Amino acid sequence: MSFKKNKYSVLKKAISKELADFVYKYFKNKRNVARVLFDSRYISPFTEYWGIWNDEQVPNTYSHYGDIAMETLLQQVKPVMEKHTGLKLSETYSYARIYKKGDVLARHKDWYSCEISTTLNLGGDDWPIYLDPTGKQGQAGVKVKLNPGDMLIYSGCDLEHWREEFIGKDCGQVFLHYNKVGSKMAKENALDKRPLLGLPAWFKGAKLTNSTK
């Protein structure tokens, strides 16, 4: 399947099943610890570097922008993304979720920071993703099933994508986002405008001091 022709491609075993399982267990542990920290008021409910449960796209589901382990995957997977898309890419950000029973990912297209994206299956119960390779809206779409370690590469700004209601218990996915290198806009948007990968969104536009470079 050609990404250049279809604007999407499925890559089996993009990372090993063992690595996917490690990251999946790590992220579930982080979710559980975060819940205790928030509920005990050990940390502020507005603290985002432990993840959130108030994501508007999938409410009441544990989600995390820029987790350091996921951002490391963002770096590690980039050469694979470049090989299979034929594009030179720059990292923008990662976003991970552990979906729960009843969750739905509504049909949508992405914004510029998600120009070239992948959804990487970390583990849990099966939950296919759908996308419409025609670039139109409201089409039946193509059903894509991923096993742990598999990923779907897609042009997020061009192709509508979604997931229907989840009937399993949980499912761990991480979205890894990139821009095509070459434009002024892409250069300005590098790392989603953060000075370093792994920093929360609060650091967009921030400048590092000499002591932190």
Model-derived features: positions:
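Fe(II)/2-oxoglutarate
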Residues: 1-4, 201-206
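Non-heme Fe(II)/2-oxoglutarate
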Residues: 1-85
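A short, polar/charged loop/turn motif at coil->beta-strand junctions and beta-hairpin connectors
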Residues: 2-5, 90, 123, 170
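Mobile, glycine-enriched helix-loop/loop "lid" segments at the mouths of ligand-binding/catalytic clefts
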Residues: 192-204
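Catalytic core of non-heme Fe(II) oxygenases with the double-stranded beta-helix
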Residues: 101-162, 170-174, 179-195
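Conserved double-stranded beta-helix
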Residues: 54-60, 73-130
